[in-house]
Amino acid sequence: MRGRSASDALSECTKMTDRPPHILFRDDTSGQVMLFADPTEIIVAHTRAEVFTGLARMEEARKSGKWLAGYIAYEAGHLFEDKLARFATENRTTPLLCFGIFDHPQPDDHPLAQPTQRLENEEFLTAPKATWDFATYQNRFDRLHHHLMQGDCYQANLTMPIEARWSGDPRAAFWSLIERQPVKYGALVDLGGPVILSRSPELFFRTDEEGWIETHPMKGTARRGSTPAEDEAIKQTMLADIKTQAENRMIVDLLRNDISRITEVGTLDVPKLFDIETYPTVHQMVSHVQAKLLPNLEIRDILAALFPCGSITGAPKISAMTILHELEDGPRDVYCGAIGMIAPSGAMRFSVAIRTLTLFDDGRAVFNVGGGIVIDSTAEAEYEECLLKARFAIGDQPIAGTGSV
């Protein structure tokens, strides 16, 4: 683990840019923002030992009255399972864990919390290209489908990267993406490494000061209609569709099982099942799971039970993660990890880092897209869904490298 002081962090950021280290969270549905700037320390972990040392340092800082904000990469979840741990550091250049330690959130009128506008019609991302054409996707899909037929897993969330070029100010891009697709869990993370822009609609988990935890698994996607009547018909079709319900219920059951490991017996509840949330390009099926946490848990305990979120792995979870490691070319990095904040009280909130871009200093941008595959899925429909989900970042730009579907 590398713990960097505030002056070191600022120096590292300004070597490459004029941006001070900061993290901005925004709920676009309410307009509420929460900004963290001027970190006293930045925790960066690249190995198993560094991750667990970093989590301990985070807990120590929280208990001393500090706030924490940052991200944990998808592959860090491998570290909580001995049989997967060796996969965590394969072929990666980005951190497994990156969190700032802060004295307090900044006021809403802080300059870094204010909108920064781009020029009209200026594209932030250009030259998007799928790293898997349809033939490649079909091959991975068929191999996954074989696992499903053999009963090795019941569902798995197969993902692929889209690469593009980026230019300009990431803050301006963050605000432009809000206009394209408002979400509840938007985040911009700029702590000196790759800049992370997340447009996640999905809550991973939230805990409160009284010890309650809730999670909102999201599974089931349909394209928006062109009229309100068509939208309503699509939503009713989703609610009646056995495949969509089965996908969502499998993840609900997985998360109920995960949460039960760290919560009091008799408190587990599913207050919402098969709810539909509507976004500019898609409808999503969402359910809610909640329970009362056992006393005296630390962030490591919660992550060991829940991370990564079952909605972006599959079921059974460990089997699905093992199969996906075999099928996907490289690390997901921040994508499908978690981005969030922790208060001194122990209350915390993390989103599932879907619809999330990683911006590298050389002008390269990477974001993954994917979906849950079950036994009656088809490669054509799933690949088209992947391309649809890419629209949050690139709008109507054509995606190169897809081949014929």
Where are each of the predicted segments found?
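Extended alpha-helical targeting/anchoring segments
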Residues: 5-405
